[in-house]
Every structure is written in structure tokens, then in C-alpha cells.
Amino acid sequence: MQLSTYVRALWLALAGLFAAPTRGAVIPEDRADLLYHYYDGGGTTVSGPALLVRKGIGERVSAYASYFIDNVSCASIDVLTTASPFKEKREEYGGGVDYLYGNTTIGLAVLRSKESDYVANTFGATVTHEVLDGLTTFSLGYNVGRDNVGKVHTDFADHVNRYQYKLGVSQVVTKSLLMNLNYEAILEDGYLHSPYRAARLLGLSVPEAYPRTRDSYAMALGIVKGLGSNDGQLNASAHLRYRYFWDTWNIRAHTVDLRYVTRLGDRWLVEPRYRHYKQSAASFYADDFSTQMVFMARDRELSDFSSNALGAKASYQLFNNRFSFNRVTLNFDYESIRYDYTNFTDVRTGRLYAYKANVFQVFLSGWF
């Protein structure tokens, strides 16, 4: 069974833990990360380990490889109203290399994930370049993906082509102020919905019908402000990020992300955070259609809804310069999310649907 959009987003967030460096003129440090993640919300649980190792090759090249497992148990409202609860396993293999040339870093990456009814293959390339003594960094990114879509116990087969373009600029404004602006475009064509879901027409279940193309865009502005202590040293930072999303399905979305990072003593680094998200519904979405339409969807992720997330991350430095490691940290991350739907009802109760989700991660990181 195909995983929900949130689970895929969680996956991307975990992968971002091991992303290329933020500064183009320095290759990443050698490191290894072992992670366990757990998600529970809306009748779906996802858990599993992740492993990544990154190693420098000379002074200009850094290579990495990653492996993730998701064990999924799903009894979400979509499943309970249109199908049967299921269990699923998803695996992902990835790898990449970053090459440093002067003030420019070029990165290449490949990714393959596999479920019983969905196989995704992605190739990506990035370029970052620093100017003005590192005060300004420009970044470009391109990803191309080919997904194969199936349906268990049937011979159904289709595909999705995906092309992603990214542009970004980061500017050091003062010694304690950093700003960045990012643009993203994703062009998709193919089978863009789930073969398991159904729409409702006058209370009856009918097959969903989606457009076979979707273009989506996003702009994001981020601000990081360093905060000092009595001795004048920066030991904390405040982060603010706003993202606006729009697409050709008439969805409009706003995201506001606030976080605060500070040190507690010599070993602890803590990061409380809050995120608000709100989106409008797709033009062909309805909770219950009154007449037959060319395109018809009842995916709650295309409806009008909002979410509020409150979380915190804590990192504890275990030791330095022992067991062949320069530094080892133990990290914990927890987030509680509340989803509220404006025009999606639970057909079992007739009430507007809402649910809470909990996300927990624990990982061990070592630099060598």
C-alpha cells in the first residue's frame, strides 16, 4: 500500500538529517548516524531504523550511503471506509557524492525506495557557490524521478514522472543575522492518486478521477538571529521561516515555522519549536459530490485543513576523542501534531474529521 503524504514528508525530513553541507566551500565532516523513528497518528503507525555513513575521499570529495526501513501498520480513516487494515514494509537505498572545487560544491545523489505496490527511483544534482568571502551563497538543485504505481492482488500498473527544480540564496547580513530565500517548482505527470481510495457521489462510493498533470511551486523566506550571553559570545539562535505554496490544482498553503536553539551547560543543545500549516482545497475535491464531474477526489490531503505542531529536540554530547571518534552525540526528537479538517467528514460519525499524531526519533551520531 502507498504511504501517506505525511509519512513521505517525514521520510524526507529524516533524509535531510544527512544532507550536503549548508556552506558550499567546505565538504561535510566524516560521520555515521544510526536512527530509529516512530510515527503514530490517525490509525497509522510507522517505525523503523535508518543508517547513514559519510566519508571523505581526499580533500575535495565526500561520499555517503544510506539505508532506511519503514514498517507500516495502517488502519486510517481512508482504509477503514474503503478497504481493509494492512501492514507494509518499505525500504530505501540511497547514495551520493559531493565534490568541492574552489568555492563551488557539486553534489550528485541517487535514491530508490520499494513497497509491494510502489517503486520510486530518483536522481538528483545540486550546485552551491559562495561569493563575497562566503557572505553570500547561491544554490541550484534538480531532481528527476520515475515512480511505478501498482495495486496489490491485481495487474494494475501505471507510472509517475517527477521533475523538481530548486533555487536558493543565503546572505550573512551581520555577524548575528542570516537570511535565506528559496524557490521550488515540481512538475508531475502520470497516475497522481491512490488506486485504493474512492470519492462519494450522493453518499455512494465511486472511483476517484484525477488530472494526470500537476505543477506546484513554493517560495520560502528564512531568518536566523544569533543571540548572545553576558560574555558577548553567541550561544543561542532564533529561527523564523515562512513558506507559501501554490499549484495548478488550486491548492494554496501557508507554513510558519518558529524555533529556538540554545545550549544548556557544556553538553546539552535543545531546540523547542512550533509550526502552523493551513491549506485550501483542490478545485476538484468534495466531501460528497452532488453531481458527476470529470475529476473527483475525496483525499483528505486535498481538502481544506490546518495543522499545529509543537516539538522539541535535545542533543547530548556523550564524549570526545574516544573509540576512534572525534565526537559522539545522542539525540532525541519529539513532535505532537494536531490536524483539523474543515470539509472532510468521518462517514462513520458524520462529524468533521480531526486527529492527533506523535512523532519520535532517537539517533546516535558520531564524527570521525
Model-identified regions with their sequence ranges:
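Outer membrane beta-barrel transmembrane domains
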Residues: T82-A83, I186, L192-G222, T248-D257, ...
